[in-house]
Amino acid sequence: MKSLILAEKPSVARDIADALQINQKRNGYFENNQYIVTWALGHLVTNATPEQYDKNLKEWRLEDLPIIPKYMKTVVIGKTSKQFKTVKALILDNKVKDIIIATDAGREGELVARLILDKVGNKKPIRRLWISSVTKKAIQQGFKNLKDGRQYNDLYYAALARSEADWIVGINATRALTTKYDAQLSLGRVQTPTIQLVNTRQQEINQFKPQQYFTLSLTVKGFDFQLESNQRYTNKETLEQMVNNLKNVDGKIKSVATKHKKSYPQSLYNLTDLQQDMYRRYKIGPKETLNTLQSLYERHKVVTYPRTDSNYLTTDMVDTMKERIQVTMATTYKDQARPLMSKTFSSKMSIFNNQKVSDHHAIIPTEVRPVMSDLSNRELKLYDMIVERFLEALMPPHEYDAITVTLEVAGHTFVLKENVTTVLGFKSIRQGESITEMQQPFSEGDEVKISKTNIREHETTPPEYFNEGSLLKAMENPQNFIQLKDKKYAQTLKQTGGIGTVATRADIIDKLFNMNAIESRDGKIKVTSKGKQILELAPEELTSPLLTAQWEEKLLLIERGKYQAKTFINEMKDFTKDVVNGIKNSDRKYKHDNLTTTECPTCGKFMIKVKTKNGQMLVCQDPSCKTKKNVQRKTNARCPNCKKKLTLFGKGKEAVYRCVCGHSETQAHMDQRMKSKSSGKVSRKEMKKYMNKNEGLDNNPFKDALKNLNL
């Protein structure tokens, strides 16, 4: 009898097979005399669509809403059905005694496995592999500590409740809005409050009125002393009068105070912090950061589990620190890391806190030494940031003397504040940091002359537009960006981690860009006309971050066994009925801001011009029609003059390729250019065909020369 291990992806299945020496490769799985390892391809099973309950629901009609099934159905995803059949056969195989779930250790990973097991009708015992890295050592250690699968039932119930609630609310709200206003509109419990966050910030900026104010400082021996009150004066004349009173008046140093202070390194990275920093430093978006991080985790195995919301480590990891530091010696931080090899680490250090780690600890390097030449430029940047933050967290604090010099002149007090570094501590990790010295020339009681008075004009600045990094942070802490009626609501938002989860926020932002609800101009995220109308047409409660936070709070309670999933789903059904009725009874109107005069060739309605990732297309305004045609799209064809990518306008014989430099050419000319470019060249396929044809011939010098090529 064997144990069947179910991984989430083929790459993880290979890692497990390698760690446990499961060497026999089969079609869709690995096997030895103790284990069988197979895999999902992400989700193999998903919620059924409305038309899979009732074929009449394929057409979107307002009168059919709300769609609330008595029992939720699941279906096998068509494009991965072959692998599902393999997994199903293995689960039901008589030689399999139990199932070991080895999908991602979290809510969604649990759902991936359990939906498959439920669809198959599994009755066999379940055990759970729960690890935060896929190194050989972590896998082997994890298999020594397998958990009873029943310990994770509540996690599964929470995942299932989240999935079903999103289906019930999302399907009905989107269909209701779309059919009511004859437009492609989408609502969701996470995406709609996110649009509201962006809109609120945009309104604050639009309504902001700058105010002018003035400050006063004095220059003494080359040092600037600021007026102690730090008051902003809106009346410049007040300061000018003060300056007149200071003319030809000497000052006196009232005190020189030195206070020794310490500053501590930032917390270790969780996913949101890392995504925010990658955007701030390199303008790399959250989705790209997560994909790169996933590659470092799965392919290279040099970082721990990416989708974590924790900034801390567990105390049982103390003994692994030296090994992790050792691998960082392969990076540009080797000189800074070397002293840490002789340091003793304690579980009392602030980075170790079991209470602040739920599913997964902070993102840190694994014990696998990276092959730096194998990493892409983006992977190198990301890995360096993780190493930098990790090493900083293990270093002693930065120490400095905070010096405050107080100056009195004509009854007014001015201060000079300077910091002098005494111990670099964690700041030694970053390049360019060094010990500083201040040769301040002041002593208590000194009489000093004022060499210059400075009245400076300032203007208050509006809040900044969100960018992809700061929007992530706002989703995590929406209570800092919106007005709430009650302080307890702010606490709810803080405790539940805000809108969405670390694993879903990047996808939500990406989706909002794709549906043209928000847009980014010069890195500034703004709500589009469509996004504003979605907020106006959506039920008010669905635009509030508080509602989704309250739902997330209940999901967490389900996860902890303190709330019934069935109760939560019933609440979502009642909420959905109210939402649909509200939309049905609304007298509001929707106005397409991108409607063209081009008629749809299928149904005759006017088409809408929409932006896509690679250009523009025309889409029928009727969602049930689904007719689309390209207006323009970027191609991989290059301009013969400047070598930039050409944009294609139109199609067929009428198509024209244009470049930003002004070059243009017809489809016929492009075809001719490509033909002449490729003429005389022999393809790899043709060379292989020639080799095979002449396999039995001797004394063929051309064939012998081709043998040395990697074909």
From Swiss-Prot:
An example Gene Ontology biological process: DNA topological change
Keywords: DNA-binding, Isomerase, Magnesium, Metal-binding, Topoisomerase
Gene3D superfamilies xref list: 3.40.50.140, Topoisomerase I, domain 2, Topoisomerase I, domain 3, Topoisomerase I, domain 4
Residues the record marks as active site: 305
Catalysed transformations (reactions): ATP-independent breakage of single-stranded DNA, followed by passage and rejoining
Amino-acid positions noted as binding Mg(2+) in the UniProt annotation, renumbered to this chain: 8, 104
Superkingdom field: Bacteria
Site (Interaction with DNA): 60, 167, 175, 307
Start and end residues of each Topo IA-type catalytic domain: 152-580
Keyword check for DNA-binding: yes
InterPro entries, per database record: Topo_IA (IPR000380), Topo_IA_2 (IPR003601), Topo_IA_AS (IPR023406), Topo_IA_cen (IPR013497), Topo_IA_cen_sub1 (IPR013824), Topo_IA_cen_sub2 (IPR013825), Topo_IA_cen_sub3 (IPR013826), Topo_IA_core_domain (IPR023405)
PROSITE patterns, alphabetized: TOPO_IA_1 (PS00396), TOPO_IA_2 (PS52039), TOPRIM (PS50880)
Cofactor or coenzyme needed: Mg(2+)
Residue span of region Interaction with DNA: 186-191
Primary role: Releases the supercoiling and torsional tension of DNA, which is introduced during the DNA replication and transcription, by transiently cleaving and rejoining one strand of the DNA duplex. Introduces a single-strand break via transesterification at a target site in duplex DNA. The scissile phosphodiester is attacked by the catalytic tyrosine of the enzyme, resulting in the formation of a DNA-(5'-phosphotyrosyl)-enzyme intermediate and the expulsion of a 3'-OH DNA strand. The free DNA strand then undergoes passage around the unbroken strand, thus removing DNA supercoils.
Protein name: DNA topoisomerase 3
